[in-house]
């Protein structure tokens, strides 16, 4: 069995930046253990699998796997999946994906790239001393939590975000959490870094789902709904951000870097 495969850098303007994702269209779902084995073989932060949506609720069903596990939401691999579908049909301007735990997601073509609509995840203030300690943050300005397993830790400035040197083993022992460190930025309205060692991703390069948590917080801080963001990983990536009620809209571009087939014996 041969499966079409593309590796796409999302939230990127050139190769080797943004966040790489595998995109693999299927005619029907393979067994869960096969999907996980493929994602492990790809060894990318995420591999996105899609099949035509027989329910008619959306164009495709969409699932995401890291090398370690299936996840409930992945923004950058959804943007990459939209790029894959819309790039194959220049007459098409929008594609919808039905997900198992995050509702229906939309990717639309814009004049400069793509717009991805995700649910807005409103985090609430909560003491997170173990997570802050694992991140080597002695005195965070604020700590917030969303029950999807996302921690948002606010620090004083962009330099502090860039200087973070986490204890990844300590973070791993805390379980399936996504740890976001964020601050007001100089290169953008706000900057972030994201650490997810439980999912075999020590530091995620550019994380769409993390912005579903960060955007509502920063919209309240800035008193406006439209912002710019930069994820200050080694690869780095710019994200346009807008809070739209119970949703967030992320804008960015994608670059296809590999196309081929994945062979299953």
Locate predicted features.
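Active-site proximal loop and beta-alpha junction motif in alpha/beta enzyme cores
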Residues: 1-73, 79-265
């Amino acid at each position: 069995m041969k499966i079409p495969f593309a590796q796409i850098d999302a939230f990127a303007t050139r190769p080797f930046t943004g966040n790489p994702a595998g995109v693999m269209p299927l005619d029907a779902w393979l067994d869960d253990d096969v999907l996980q084995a493929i994602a492990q073989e790809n060894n990318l932060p995420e591999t996105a699998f899609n099949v035509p949506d027989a329910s008619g609720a959306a164009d495709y069903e969409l699932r995401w796997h890291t090398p370690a596990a299936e996840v409930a939401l992945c923004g950058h691999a959804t943007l990459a999946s939209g790029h894959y579908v819309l790039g194959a049909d220049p007459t098409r301007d929008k594609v919808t994906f039905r997900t198992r735990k995050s509702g229906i997601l939309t990717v639309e073509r814009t004049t400069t790239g793509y717009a991805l609509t995700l649910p807005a995840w409103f985090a609430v203030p909560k003491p997170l001393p173990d997570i802050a300690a694992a991140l080597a943050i002695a005195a965070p300005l604020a700590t917030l939590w969303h029950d999807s397993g996302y921690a948002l830790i606010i620090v004083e400035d962009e330099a502090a975000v860039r200087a973070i040197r986490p204890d990844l083993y300590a973070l791993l022992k805390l379980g399936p959490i996504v740890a976001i460190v964020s601050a007001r930025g100089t290169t953008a309205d706000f900057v972030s870094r994201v650490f997810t060692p439980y999912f075999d991703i020590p530091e995620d390069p550019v994380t769409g789902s993390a912005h579903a948590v960060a955007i509502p917080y920063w919209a309240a801080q800035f008193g406006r709904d439209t912002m710019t963001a930069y994820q200050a990983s080694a690869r780095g990536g710019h994200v346009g951000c807008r809070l739209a009620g119970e949703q967030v809209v992320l804008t960015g571009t994608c670059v296809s870097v590999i196309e081929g087939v994945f062979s299953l014996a």
